[in-house]
């Protein structure tokens, strides 16, 4: 992991097209601004983890009887 120190209004550039700027530092909280192409997905880590968790729950809760009914309808 690369660790950098930045002050307010200083920034970091990633891959020439992603710019991160320190907007403010207040009471243990840092506000960051991001400039990136619209195709770049930027998420807070906890939101990404929640999405992954929900996707895993959704894929694990397949009703086996429903699958059997689908197999009966779709015969090779």
From Swiss-Prot:
Homodimer; the beta-strands of each monomer intercalate to form a hydrophobic core, while the alpha-helices form wings that extend away from the core. NCBIfam families: csrA, PRK00568.1. This is Translational regulator CsrA. Keywords: Bacterial flagellum biogenesis, Cytoplasm, Repressor, RNA-binding, Translation regulation. SUPFAM superfamilies: CsrA-like (SSF117130). One of its GO terms (molecular function) is mRNA 5'-UTR binding. GO terms for cellular component: cytosol. It holds the Pfam family CsrA. Belongs to the CsrA/RsmA family. One of its GO terms (biological process) is bacterial-type flagellum organization. A translational regulator that binds mRNA to regulate translation initiation and/or mRNA stability. Usually binds in the 5'-UTR at or near the Shine-Dalgarno sequence preventing ribosome-binding, thus repressing translation. Its main target seems to be the major flagellin gene, while its function is anatagonized by FliW. It is found in: Cytoplasm.
């Amino acid at each position: 992991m690369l660790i950098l120190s930045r002050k307010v209004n200083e920034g970091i550039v990633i891959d020439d097209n992603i710019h991160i700027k320190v907007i403010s530092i207040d009471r243990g909280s840092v506000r960051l601004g991001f400039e990136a192409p619209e195709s770049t997905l930027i998420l807070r880590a906890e939101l990404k983890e929640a999405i992954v968790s929900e996707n895993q729950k959704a894929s694990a809760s397949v009703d086996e009887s429903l699958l059997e009914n689908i197999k009966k309808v779709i015969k090779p």
